[in-house]
């Protein structure tokens, strides 16, 4: 399974291994995002991102400084970091590296139930790269609670990317608003755990599907794991059945998938 290409597509906003290479971010990442108009907040909320001084990553490459993310209620209000700062995660409990965010990969408003429904704030951040080029990428989704005039985290997940892991928010199509994750299995035949979370009526994400992939690690498929598994995902959720047109993602190089086909239940682009 080849690495996915690009951070965003027209159908999905994805955590992309190719977008997370150990390079210095080309432009300063400090920014502010006005949330008042898009969320119709009672107070003038905004997302604030502050970038620290440049550092070296764990491969001794130049890297951007640590990011401080917070939500500020007006220009003079306190900046609250807890709602947008997930707990730090290391590969193992005894691992010394702190995986604080250094790369702002995505900060935008998304519409899981269409443009006329309530939006969510999507944040994707990446840690420093380790010596082997791996990186912890954290994905968060937040909604706005008008009754309490505050933002709350409704989804949080982090993973690496060296083994084709991915966390993807689906922006449109039959799975619109879902979050799909692909993470490698630790034992033969070395496929992936595919997990689908959907937004419930209560406003929180809940798991609706988990299964072992038909896709295998290093199988030569140019598609991202989630794309190659899309027929299986949609079939198990009752959104697609054999005989209907196959889902047609990009072919892995930004070009349309002209001839989608199934091989051992996984989607390939010929």
How should these model regions be labeled?
Residues 1-9:
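Bacterial N-terminal signal peptides
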Residues 14-46, 50-64, 70, 165-270:
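Acidic, small-residue rich beta-repeat scaffolds with periodic aromatic anchors
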Residues 69-90, 140-157, 196-209:
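Surface-exposed loop/turn elements that mediate protein-protein interactions on large endomembrane-trafficking
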Residues 71-117:
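Short N-terminal edge-element motif at the start of the domain
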Residues 100-150:
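Extracellular-facing segments of soluble proteins and assemblies that are Gly/Ser/Thr-biased and enriched
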Residues 127-137, 158-163, 185-191:
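His-enriched metal-coordination microenvironments in redox/metal-binding proteins
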Residues 135-136, 140-179:
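Short helix-loop boundary/capping segments
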